[in-house]
Amino acid sequence: VISYITGHAICRGYIDGIHSTLDWDIFDNTIYDNAKLIDVLNMASGIHNYHDGENFINSKRWPNQHSIQSIMKKELKNSVAGENKYYYANTNTNVVASYLIHKMGWKNYKKMLKEIFNDKVGIENNVVMHRQNKSNRGQHTLTYGMFMTRYDYMRVAVAMLNDWNNNTCEGQYLKDLYENKISKGDEYNPNNSSQSMSNSKYYAGQFYVGMNGDERPIFIMSGFGGQNINIDFENNKIISIMSIHRNFDWMKLVNSNF
């Protein structure tokens, strides 16, 4: 969902586009210095030498507790980006979320969220976003954490489907993400296809794509526990599962229907 929000920021002119270079002095002399937005969205920032997939290797700190500013000063100070390849690290999403606030300011960011979720998506309940609990009030820092009802998540998926089909600016953003997808390399494991993240061959700007290795534009969002939303843009189909645990047959309930 952070990526979808990013598309709206681009369409409002706050960011030049997915190929723009991150412009924030806190990134100086870190792996994000001169990084392209699309590489960060694609989990290809080169952070794999410093991050174990959940925590930072040298400090064991969890990125969802500490501000982006703190992380750049401690864990990633004088860091050098590794190979440009897919490596899932939630820090990348936190960087994008925080970068939006840096470019927009909190006031404009909150205004845009209202325009997206209330006016466009039509949510019926609140959306709660999670900021790092050890950050300072007013800091331009945010995590990927987001809470909303299962029906409001579905409404977001419908809005994405409509954007794609109506070729809105945000819809073109989603198509650009798909055109700039990257291979997941060894992370693609069709022999262990019980989960969407294993079954998808590519990654496109925060979305799993390439179900069964196919080239059809089906976007997959995998969240906490058993949260799973699948959007088939060509066939106007959405399948959403909002279970607490992931102990369900994904191939039977989801994959077999595409």
Q: What annotation goes with each model-predicted range?
A:
Residues 1-17, 40, 96-100, 153-156:
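Active-site SXXK
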Residues 11-48, 75-78, 104-143:
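Active-site helix/loop module of the DD-peptidase/beta-lactamase fold
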Residues 57-65, 131-147, 192-197, 202-205:
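Carbohydrate-binding/catalytic loop surfaces
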Residues 92-99, 144-166, 227-244:
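Active-site-proximal alpha-helical segments within enzyme catalytic domains
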Residues 112-183:
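Active-site-proximal binding-pocket segments
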Residues 123-131, 179-239:
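Active-site Gly/Thr loop motif
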Residues 249-258:
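Short, gly/Ser/Thr-rich active-site loops of penicillin-recognizing serine hydrolases
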